[in-house]
Swiss-Prot record:
Protein name: Methyl-CpG-binding domain protein 5
Cellular component GO terms, alphabetical: chromosome; midbody; nucleoplasm
Compositionally biased tracts (Pro residues): 333-343
Keyword terms: Chromosome, Nucleus, Ubl conjugation pathway
Length: 1498
């Protein structure tokens, strides 16, 4: 604080006689009054500002004397005499400059910025439109910046000083006028003056510009000026170009951004400027402008996004930071900004906060510009604000870079602001989307800023709130969304703006992890940020820039690198040299990555964002959501969505990277593979995804948080994460309960989006609440997350659902990221896209999704697949809409995809009765085929599966999606373009044939459908029901009706009709019959559970938090479980497995329910087997088909399946499947391409169905289960470590003995999961589940099927956790690792895996031995056979399980530790479900020794 000599700092002499200017400080007198310039460049125009500045953490207070007497040191009387500065004073000033980190940072940033100046021109070029929009904002911006600056100075000066440098510098250098602005003491007058003054400032900027490295005449502002020049009235487009053109300008631009952007942000944040409100309300461009003010380039979304300018703003992390601040301004919590003060970044942060992260906001306007349409589109002001904020964020980074503000931003964690902010955003979405967790400081900066803002209208939050989206920001819901949007926007902007994206890496989704990363590892963050963020940035650049010409340069530009440098600097207070070196490195990395991403992503904005930003943009996407949401309709929205999805992915990646988990790599690979496999399709879907992601807001903070967490923790989706086109709807899922679907789309979605930035994606989002698609689906097409998550992670989100169907983002995407995944308008997309989306959000689903989306395009309305990841992480997929009949033609090409959709459709069919018929057949046909395709996505899609169960067919669809996701990477383009619809088409051809029968049967299946749907429906019904209302019920019914219908009924009843149908189905897809049979075998009630379980497992695999809440039908379970992780939720579900079964039974009316489940299972089995067969391209008789399936999973499994099939009654069922397999064979090659993963997944799919089917008939189930168990066992041996099918099986198991049958299903799922795991979850759970462990696991689960331990599906994290736990458990056992991995990855029938489900302690994992599963059903049908009616309670189920287990389990079968783990898991399950699984004491006693082992393992 005493930067110079104490006497220098505040010469006591400098009393009334002569004012002594503190060392390192400058005092300027002009017509506006006295202006004090802090060493960091903050401009303080009044005592209040000085106080605020000094009280703001992170502001530069160097050179001030210790006992600081403000009136003595700071004299704002223009006539006061100033003590002449002596040479000594000058030297002291120099010393202060050397000693002052803030100053050094500013200089370093300026230097860095200048070094990166070149790209700026292109950036400037990018936002021609921005200028216009900005123009209206200019005045307000000018005014606001000044006010903001004043405020900033007051509150943020200290903290901002460094960062303030940006704003102040802007004021000083970029806009001395701004300083003057600040000088205008009155906030109101300042603001008013700001209007006139800002331009002056800008004009005067040259004068002050000298002060800071950024002094480029109004370059700083001009940068915003390009979009801000009009805004500021400073120059015009030319200034913008000019500033952009010249490094100085850009440098100044940054300051300008800080200043102008600040004002803009302020403006954004405060209503003071009418333009801001205009901007917000007025036009996207305007909003852009406001943001642009922050970042000149942000002015135009494209510019911001695409041009270096944008990048610059991005660099202006300070701005970014400011945005968070601004957002945080909304949030009084900004108090924390002071904490950030330690780092310059923090200082800047406060400044930004003080300045109103408008600097960030400015970039957001840039973003808004990018998303002009959306901004405009969104009457929802917040949307605009969001856009602005994101833009600001994006733009900000560049601005920040030049200014010290940049440095603080990092501290603020501009990235984290986005990042943590995202998290916090999610957390505080209500407060301020931007209140980043990381920005806690930023928020607190903002708080300070708020104080400041509140203190002075200049950055008055209210004004911002009222004007920008401050109002929205203020209001937690809509405003919050706005706020969130703003927060998100920073992310989004980054996403939007390739360059900002880098800073955005800390976008909400990424932010969660990234935020932490930033927070935790500023340096690494910078490095990582430069990698991850840069990647995102590059991705973002590609994505953000609609005309991504300069995107490439942007990343290098320092937008990202600088951001990272700033982050690094801020976080670590690195010396300028360190900062510069970091920035240079980041820039290089960014450029390299960007180049790669650009080429990779192809310029397609959406595609780029999707592919390029796969890693980085996830975060961006999340950030982008609000904007994207708004933009959704617009092309920019595309970028936003893509960015959102990418952001979710990035966020997931960040979190993964943070964890250093292979999954990230796997996801990246997957994503890449998907991108590669469907490079062309990807753009569209990605764009859609991005849109979806953008719209993938999570309405509620909790949702957002969940989405974020889902996506961040579970790569997936966007959703979410994750965060797809359905993102808007995502809230529907999660927020669905809270908001109407449609509303959700616009407001809730935006809110959610902002909040979830996710991806909840996230990613997704991610978990991507956003996935819950608005049924209208303009956003839906824009995919959420995803996710990616995926997805949301997720996700979505997410982002996860390219169609927005898979917002898991997201993902998981997310998504979550999921989180809420909802595919809404695209029938095709629902399954393929959802799966695809999931993949994108969590893996690389983008490519698949794109096709899906494309396909969905024609009939997507037909299928409204709502895959929602509930807050608890449950992913509910509901399909509502019309059959994809028109799509059927494509279906013929890729029946399984179409069928997938059909499956989804069934849900939709539920909504539309006529839909179900086409859907059902399609589903049945497509599911089998789709499974192989989606198997990789199985994990992702498992979420869908969870949701799909609601649709009855959803199970298969989910599985298909999951399976499809992986294979979709290969098949997605075909699948999406052809298969998605093909399912319908082919199904219609064949399935319809069968379907006619089916339809005839449909009426009956309708009741059964609930059985299938019931568990699922129950789990997701609440969400879905809210989202789709009676559609959900219809889904259940239709689910049953569609493909499932015939099978779902009693094996006899269902089979007869279905057999008829199957025959016809077979023609459509040979698999039809087998599938039918399999479904029948699969078990009526189990299908739903299996679907849920699968979905949960998928979500878990994705790393999404999956909480299955049995809602509608299994209402009882839903209550306790929602908070639980997927596993716990599933456990609850399982806890109510009986409940589920019961519900299913009730819904199905006894056997009917079973039939439905059976149908679903059969479908699943079909889908799985068909895919497997397709994968293998082997047509085989029943055994053969199985073999094919197995070969898909693994050869051994194949044989096992065959052998098992033969032994079991399953054989017949499988026969039908084999028929399906034949058609599947056709599709086999795509799946086959991925022998390990895809093949496994296809196998898994096949298995899943068997598992699902077995529950149908106890004995048959037993046979099936045995087969499955055997297959699983062998498969395990075959190294199907990710035995999600096991999880699915467990899910199936939830329904009593069926679980055993489910085991088969679970195996199918497991295979897919395994594949996914292999790709995405290798780290914790490597392919280590051995056959023995798996067998034990399965066996145990089989015995324990009633317990519905299966019900608990671990999230990917759960799986990882389990795997790790399992590994720990069996550390001594060589196969322990394998087994463990396998266990978590692929849970067998009875296997309840409490992996690291979010919020749940990882269970060792309950294992059902294959023997148990097999024997329980096979040996003692009476005992093992648990009918839905029988399994009325978890306790009952547990008891039945224990009985079966005792009988069927061979003492040696289960490892002791396995037994113990199972026992423990059961206990935990009971605890969680609140039910006591009454396991016979004998069982428990038997298990005790194992616990020791497990403990040891642990």
């Amino acid at each position: 604080m005493n930067g110079g000599k104490e006497c220098d700092g505040g010469d006591k002499e400098g009393g009334l006689a002569a004012i002594q200017v503190p060392v390192g400080w400058q005092r300027r007198v002009d017509h506006n009054g006295v202006l004090y310039i802090s060493p960091s460049g903050s401009l303080l125009s009044c005592l209040d500002q000085v106080k605020t500045y000094l009280l703001t953490d992170g502001t530069c207070k160097c050179g001030l004397e210790c006992p600081l007497i403000l009136p003595k040191v700071f004299n704002f009387d223009p006539g006061a005499a100033v003590k002449q500065r002596t040479a000594e004073d000058v030297k002291a000033d120099d010393d202060v400059t050397k000693l002052c980190i803030h100053k050094r940072k500013i200089i370093a940033v300026a230097t860095l910025h200048q070094s990166m100046e070149a790209p700026h021109p292109s950036l400037v070029l990018t936002s021609p439109g921005g200028g216009t929009n900005a123009t209206p904002v200019v005045p307000s911006r000018a005014a606001t910046p000044r006010s903001v600056r004043n405020k900033s100075h007051e509150g943020i000066t200290n903290s901002v000083m460094p960062e303030c440098k940006n704003p102040f510098k802007l004021m000083t250098g970029s806009s001395n006028a701004m300083g003057r602005l600040y000088m205008q003491d009155l906030p109101g007058s300042q603001q008013q003056e700001l209007h006139p003054v800002y331009p002056r400032q800008r004009l005067g900027s040259s004068e002050h510009g000298q002060k800071s490295p950024f002094r480029g005449s109004h370059g700083g502002l001009p940068s915003p000026a390009s979009s801000g020049s009009q805004i500021y009235g400073d120059g015009s487009i030319s200034p913008r170009t000019d500033p952009l053109g010249s490094p100085d300008v850009f440098t100044r631009n940054n300051p300008g951004f800080h200043g102008a952007p600040n004002s803009s942000p302020i403006h954004l944040n405060r209503t003071p400027l009418s333009p801001p409100s205009v901007m917000l309300h007025g036009s996207p461009v305007q909003s852009s402008c406001a943001m642009a003010g922050r970042t000149n380039i942000p002015l135009s979304p494209t510019l911001t996004t695409k041009s270096p300018v944008m990048k610059k703003p991005m660099c202006n992390f300070s701005t970014n930071m400011e945005i968070p601040r601004a957002m945080f301004h909304h949030k009084p919590p900004q108090g924390p900004p002071p904490p950030p003060p330690p780092s310059c970044a923090l200082q800047k942060k406060p400044l930004t906060s003080e300045k109103d992260p408008l600097g960030i906001l400015d970039p957001i306007p840039s973003k808004p510009v990018n998303q002009n349409p959306i901004i405009i589109n969104p009457t929802s002001f917040h949307s605009n604000v969001h856009s602005q904020v994101p833009v600001m964020n994006v733009s900000m980074p560049p601005a920040v870079v030049p200014l010290p503000s940049n440095l603080p931003l990092p501290t603020v964690k501009p990235g984290h602001m986005n990042h943590g902010s995202h998290v916090q955003r999610i957390q505080h979405s209500a407060s301020t989307s931007l209140s980043p967790s990381p920005v806690t400081s930023p928020v607190h900066m903002m708080g300070t800023g708020i104080g400041r803002i509140e203190a002075s209208p200049q950055r008055s939050r209210s004004s911002s709130t009222s004007s920008d989206h401050g109002n929205f920001m203020m209001p937690p819901v809509g405003p919050q969304a706005t706020c969130s949007g703003i927060k998100v926007p920073p992310r989004s902007p980054r996403s939007t703006i390739g360059s900002p994206r880098p800073s955005m890496p800390s976008s909400p989704s990424t932010k969660s992890d990234g935020h932490h990363q930033y927070k935790d590892i500023p340096n690494p963050l910078i490095a990582g940020m430069s990698n991850v963020l840069n990647t995102p940035s590059s991705a973002a650049f590609p994505t953000a820039p609609a005309g991504n010409g300069s995107v490439k340069s942007q990343p290098g530009l320092l937008g990202m690198p600088l951001n990272q440098i700033l982050n690094q600097h801020n976080a670590a207070s690195f010396p300028a040299s360190s900062l510069l070196s970091a920035a240079a490195k980041a820039q290089l990395a960014n450029q390299n990555k960007l180049a790669g991403n650009n080429s990779s992503s192809s310029n397609n904005s959406g595609a780029v964002a999707s592919s390029g930003n796969t890693e980085g943009h996830s975060t961006l996407n999340t950030m982008f959501p609000p904007t994207a949401n708004m933009l959704l309709p617009t092309g920019e929205g595309q970028s936003g969505r893509a960015a959102l999805r990418d952001k979710l992915m990035s966020q997931q990646k960040d979190s993964l990277r943070k964890r250093k988990q292979p999954p990230t790599t796997v996801l990246s690979l997957l994503r890449q593979s998907q991108m590669d496999s469907s490079a062309a399709p990807k753009p569209g879907p990605d764009l859609l995804r991005k849109h979806g992601q953008g719209s993938f807001p999570i309405s509620s903070m909790s949702q957002l948080l969940q989405s974020m967490s889902c996506q961040s923790s579970h790569l997936s989706s966007n959703s979410t994460p994750g965060c797809g086109g359905s993102n808007t709807a995502l809230p529907c899922s999660a927020n669905q309960l809270h908001f109407p679907d449609p509303n959700m789309n616009s407001t809730v979605l935006q809110n959610s989006l902002t909040q979830s930035i996710p991806l909840r994606g996230e990613a997704v989002h991610c978990h991507n609440a956003n996935t819950n698609f608005v049924h209208s689906n303009s956003p839906v097409p824009n995919h959420h997350l995803a996710g990616l998550i995926n997805q949301i992670q997720a996700s979505g989100n997410c982002g996860m659902l390219s169609q927005s169907g898979m917002a898991l983002g997201n993902s998981l995407h997310p998504n979550p990221p999921q989180s809420r995944i909802s595919t809404s308008s695209t029938p095709v997309i629902p399954n393929s896209i959802v799966s695809s989306y999931n993949q994108t959000s969590s893996e690389a689903g983008g490519s698949s999704l794109p096709s899906s989306i494309a396909i969905a395009g024609s009939n997507h309305p037909a299928i409204t697949k709502t895959t929602s990841v509930l807050q608890d992480g449950v992913i509910v997929t509901t399909a509502a809409g019309n059959p994809l009949q028109s799509q059927l033609p494509i279906g013929s090409d890729f029946p399984f995809v179409g069928q997938e959709h059909a499956l989804h459709f069934p849900s939709n069919s539920t909504a539309n009765n006529h839909l179900p018929h086409p859907l059902n057949p399609s589903l049945l046909s497509s599911l089998p085929i789709s499974l192989p395709v989606n198997q990789q996505h199985l994990l992702n899609q498992n979420l869908l599966n969870i949701l799909q169960p609601s649709a009855g067919e959803g199970d298969i669809s989910s599985i298909n999606n999951s399976l499809n996701n992986h294979q979709l990477t290969h098949l997605q383009s075909l699948l999406n373009s052809n298969q998605m619809f093909p399912p319908n088409q082919q199904p219609q051809q064949h399935l319809l044939q069968g379907h006619q029968n089916l339809q005839a049967f449909q009426g009956q299946p309708t009741v059964p459908c609930p059985a299938n749907n019931n568990p699922m429906a129950c789990l997701f019904q609440n969400f879905q029901v809210r989202m789709q209302g009676d559609a959900a019920l219809l889904n259940k019914r239709i689910s049953t009706q569609p493909g499932l219908t015939t099978l779902p009924e009693n094996p006899n009843l269902a089979l007869p009709h279905f057999q008829d149908t199957p025959c016809e189905l077979q023609p459509r897809i040979d698999l039809g019959q087998p599938m039918k049979d399999g479904l029948v075998m699969g078990g009526q009630g189990d299908a739903s559970v299996d679907a849920i379980y699968k979905a949960v497992v998928d979500a878990a695999s994705k790393g999404m938090q999956v909480v299955i809440t049995t809602a509608v039908n299994s209402t009882t379970q839903i209550s306790p479980i929602p908070a639980l992780s997927a596993m716990s939720a599933f456990t609850a579900s399982i806890g109510d497995p009986l409940n589920l079964s019961s519900a299913v039974s009730a819904v199905i009316h006894g056997r009917n329910m079973g039939g439905v489940d059976h149908d679903g299972r059969l479908r699943n089995a079909r889908g799985a087997r068909l895919p497997k067969n397709i994968d293998h391209g082997k047509n085989s008789s029943e055994g053969d088909g199985f073999e094919c399936f197995k070969s898909a999973s693994c050869h051994t499994s194949r044989k096992q399946w065959d052998g098992e099939q033969s032994p079991r009654g399953e054989r017949n069922r499988w026969k039908y499947e084999e028929f399906l397999d034949h058609p599947g064979h056709i599709h086999s090659s795509p799946c086959h391409e991925r022998p390990n993963n895809v093949s496994t997944l296809p196998f898994l799919a096949g298995e899943q169905h068997p598992i699902l089917l077995p529950p149908r008939n106890c004995q048959g189930d037993k046979i099936l289960e045995e087969n499955f168990r055997y297959n699983n066992y062998k498969r395990t041996m075959m190294s199907f470590k990710e035995r999600l099918e096991s999880t699915v099986e467990r899910c199936t198991h939830i329904n009593g003995n069926r679980p055993r049958q489910s085991r088969g299903f679970g195996e199918l799922l497991g295979t897919a999961k395994q594949d996914l795991v292999l790709e995405g979850q290798s780290p914790g759970s490597s392919n280590s589940l051995e056959s023995s462990l798996v067998k034990d696991y399965i066996h145990y689960n089989g015995d324990f099927n009633a317990k519905t331990i299966n019900g608990c599906v671990p999230s990917p994290s759960d799986a990882k956790s389990i795997s790790s736990e399992d590994d720990l458990r069996n550390p001594d056992s060589p196969s322990s690792h394998e087994l463990i991995h396998y266990r978590p990855r692929t849970f067998n029938v009875g296997d309840l895996v409490w992996g690291q489900i979010k919020g749940l302690t990882s269970w060792p994992g309950k294992f059902i031995r294959e023997d148990d599963v097999h024997n329980s059903c096979q040996q003692s049908p009476e005992e093992g056979k648990v009918e839905p009616e029988k399994l009325k309670t978890l306790t009952e189920g547990l008891e039945a399980y224990s009985r079966v287990r005792k009988r069927s389990r061979k003492s040696g079968k289960l490892n002791n530790h396995l037994e113990a783990a199972i026992h423990e898991a059961m206990s935990e399950l009971d605890k969680m479900s609140g039910t006591v699984h009454q396991i016979p004491q004998g069982d428990r006693q038997m298990r005790p020794p194992k616990p020791k082992r497990r403990k040891i393992s642990r």
